[in-house]
């Protein structure tokens, strides 16, 4: 059977549902697909479909994630929902499912709970830029004042973590009521059912409040070097996948990381032995570099637009440490532990200087299965930036995954 062509006629945005266990994330995901399916903009997915999320691996870590897609009038969305709390933590830290924005689901009957707070903190740390709120289970709250109180609490909580708590859109409704109405009558249109309308107005807010992400091709050029060859009579070629931006012959790039930063001019761009006018984000290319010897370049360096990225040795990060069952360590580790940090394309040794818990207290040690904030000092400077993902490895196996939350030096 021929594969259906992906129609790129609308801008694409990645979002996900986050929030405390049993507040209704998966039911809301089902309600969104069902209410948009009634308008022919999605394939209806029920709770059981989404809840039976397949396992996938990201940076050596197994995560259960459900991916659904749907469209609104102006956009195409890929939506990720995770069955378990640990899956969210792993997902957000590894960046397995990048989110341009999130829908935070809070049960109006219970108000914000510990995981509500933890997911907001994670969203902040890993760089989910925008959040829209759905106050679920509105049908279980008779008292209008109680609803307002929960809304106030949620806004304060978001402001605590530097989100724009005062202006974030909040929509109240009941995902379950919408799902039940749509199960009984899958063709419900706008204005025919109050609960379905609330889901549609949530999606209007998502459309309006979550900005269109800047596409990778529009960002400054960056490619992490995977391999280096010298071609007799032509010069030195660095290969890798272009992470962002575009590159063409005659442009100047900087070689950043491990050694001192140097400039070079690109004299050729090739992909699969064919000459390209221009390499773009996502392409695997070989770049021919003027005036470079094979020994000047090594795996783990990056080629980037001049001045767009700088090498650093010290950073703060948010890390998930694998459990023994996930192939991680069997024992805890302590400050000054020196594993390898796999950053883009290479391992760099680094010392973990200190650990901090969510409440700011200093932790003495880290157990497998923990999520922790850690300060890392690398032995060589490499090109790193805020929001970048990395893996922590020991003897070739992954023992943790992290994201850079702040550059120190």
Curated annotation (Swiss-Prot):
Residues 60-64 are annotated as: G2. It holds the Pfam family GTP_EFTU_D3. It is found in: Cytoplasm. Residues 136-139 are annotated as: G4. HAMAP family: EF_Tu_B (MF_00118_B). GTP hydrolase that promotes the GTP-dependent binding of aminoacyl-tRNA to the A-site of ribosomes during protein biosynthesis. This is Elongation factor Tu.
């Amino acid at each position: 059977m021929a594969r259906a062509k992906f129609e790129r006629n609308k801008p694409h945005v990645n979002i996900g549902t986050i929030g405390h266990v049993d507040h209704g994330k998966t039911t809301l995901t089902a309600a969104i697909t069902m209410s948009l399916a009634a308008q022919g903009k999605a394939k209806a997915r029920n709770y059981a479909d989404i809840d039976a999320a397949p396992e996938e691996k990201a940076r050596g870590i197994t995560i259960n994630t459900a991916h659904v897609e749907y469209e609104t009038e102006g956009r195409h969305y890929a939506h990720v929902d995770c069955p378990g709390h640990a899956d969210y933590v792993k997902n957000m830290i590894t960046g397995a499912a990048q989110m341009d924005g999130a829908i935070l689901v809070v049960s109006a009957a219970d108000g914000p709970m510990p995981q509500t707070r933890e997911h907001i903190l994670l969203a902040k740390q890993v760089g989910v830029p925008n959040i829209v709120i759905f106050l679920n289970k509105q049908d279980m709250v008779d008292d209008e004042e109680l609803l307002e109180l929960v809304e106030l609490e949620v806004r304060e909580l978001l402001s605590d973590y530097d989100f724009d708590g005062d202006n974030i859109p909040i929509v109240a409704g009941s995902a379950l009521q919408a799902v039940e109405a749509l199960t009984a009558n899958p063709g419900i249109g706008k204005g025919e059912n109050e609960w379905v309308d609330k889901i549609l107005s949530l999606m209007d807010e998502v459309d309006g409040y979550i900005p269109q992400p800047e596409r990778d091709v529009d960002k400054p050029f960056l490619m992490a070097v995977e391999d280096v060859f010298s071609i007799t009579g032509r010069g030195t070629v660095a290969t890798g996948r272009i992470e962002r931006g575009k590159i063409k012959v005659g442009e100047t790039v900087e070689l950043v990381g491990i050694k001192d930063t140097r400039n070079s001019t690109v004299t050729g761009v090739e992909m699969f032995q064919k000459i390209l006018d221009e390499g773009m984000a996502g392409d695997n290319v070989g770049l021919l570099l003027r005036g470079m010897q094979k020994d000047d370049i090594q795996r783990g360096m990056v080629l980037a637009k001049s001045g767009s990225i700088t090498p650093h040795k010290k950073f703060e990060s948010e890390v998930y440490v694998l459990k023994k069952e996930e192939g991680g360590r069997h024992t805890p580790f302590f400050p000054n532990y020196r594993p390898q940090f796999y950053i883009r394309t290479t391992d760099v040794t680094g010392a973990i200087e200190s650990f901090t818990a969510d409440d700011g207290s200093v932790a003495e040690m880290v157990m497998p299965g923990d999520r922790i904030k850690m300060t890392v000092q690398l032995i060589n400077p490499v090109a790193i930036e805020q929001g970048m993902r990395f893996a922590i490895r020991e003897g070739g196996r992954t023992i943790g995954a992290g994201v850079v939350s702040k550059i120190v030096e």
